[in-house]
């Protein structure tokens, strides 16, 4: 009989989201073979949580699709990366995306209502909470998309650009996370908030207010460049900015959307060592 170590139990928990005792039992029955344990747990329906609907769904997939001059991007969440790779979960996400594209739907509540029965059935089958989180669309003369695995998806709309350039720009957005297209697009409230932060920092250094304000002006120009697409160094050629690249191609970016799985969702972190200690006291 193979030794069932705590690290093996932890790995199975992370991959399946199942409880510690369920994982230990499955590993014991599979003689320490983690892949066989997962297969057996799937067959028995053991990969589940007691209250699925209340569990935090912070894993999942991003899906993108271009249809003519409109592109769509969708996020569907589950609880673990194990289920995110499940064929049934992937098929569900694809079906939701196809419906969004066919109906030009950008209201996530409409999609949720349309697929609620299928979602509930899939939750019962897979054993994890599933949530259609958000959907968005982008129109443009030239559209491009990029997916970094299944966790990051980007849409870019441009004028005067070819498909290869738009693809490269989408890859840049995935890597560099700009929030705006151009420095002048940075919203007034974002600028004001950052200005006050930088002014406080400058004043705390003991500089007179007039000098501090001049220092902050320079910092703000740098800040708006850092958070805007055209102001960032191009990831494939850092010696030039994205703005310079676009100028060379006589092209413009009219918009972009970047989704990353689980961004903004607070995941519940379990203290595995504490849980093991608690279970030991009970036995």
Curated annotation (Swiss-Prot):
UniProt-listed InterPro entries: EF-Ts_dimer_sf, Transl_elong_EFTs/EF1B, Transl_elong_EFTs/EF1B_dimer, Transl_elong_Ts_CS, UBA-like_sf
Gene for this chain: tsf
Similarity comment: Belongs to the EF-Ts family.
Highest taxon of the lineage: Bacteria
Name of the featured protein: Elongation factor Ts
SUPFAM superfamilies found in the cross-reference section: Elongation factor Ts (EF-Ts), dimerisation domain (SSF54713), UBA-like (SSF46934)
A Pfam family this chain is assigned to: EF_TS
Location of region: Involved in Mg(2+) ion dislocation from EF-Tu: 80-83
């Amino acid at each position: 009989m193979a030794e069932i170590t705590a690290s093996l139990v932890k790995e199975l928990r992370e991959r399946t989201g199942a409880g510690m005792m369920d994982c230990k039992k499955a590993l014991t029955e599979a003689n320490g073979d983690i892949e066989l344990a997962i297969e057996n747990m799937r067959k028995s329906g053991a990969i589940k949580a007691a209250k699925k609907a209340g569990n935090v769904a912070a894993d999942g997939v991003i899906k993108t699709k271009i249809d003519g001059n409109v592109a769509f991007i969708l996020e569907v969440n589950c609880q673990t990366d194990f289920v995110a790779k499940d064929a049934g979960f992937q098929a569900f996400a694809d079906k939701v995306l196809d419906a969004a594209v066919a109906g030009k739907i950008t209201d996530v509540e409409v999609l949720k209502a349309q697929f609620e029965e299928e979602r509930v059935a899939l939750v019962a089958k897979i054993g994890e909470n599933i949530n259609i989180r958000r959907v968005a669309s982008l129109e443009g003369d030239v559209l491009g998309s990029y997916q970094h695995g299944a966790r990051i998806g980007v849409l870019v709309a441009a004028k005067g650009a070819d498909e290869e350039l738009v693809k490269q720009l989408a890859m840049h957005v995935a890597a560099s996370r700009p929030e705006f297209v151009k420095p002048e697009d940075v919203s007034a409230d974002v600028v004001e908030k950052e200005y006050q932060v930088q002014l406080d920092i400058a004043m705390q250094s003991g500089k007179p207010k007039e000098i501090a304000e001049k220092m902050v002006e320079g910092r703000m120009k740098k800040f708006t460049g850092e958070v805007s697409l055209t102001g960032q160094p191009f990831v494939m050629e850092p010696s030039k900015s994205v703005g310079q690249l676009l100028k060379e191609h006589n092209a413009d970016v009219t918009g972009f959307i970047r989704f990353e799985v689980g961004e903004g969702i607070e995941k519940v972190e379990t203290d595995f060592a504490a849980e093991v200690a608690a279970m030991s006291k009970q036995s």
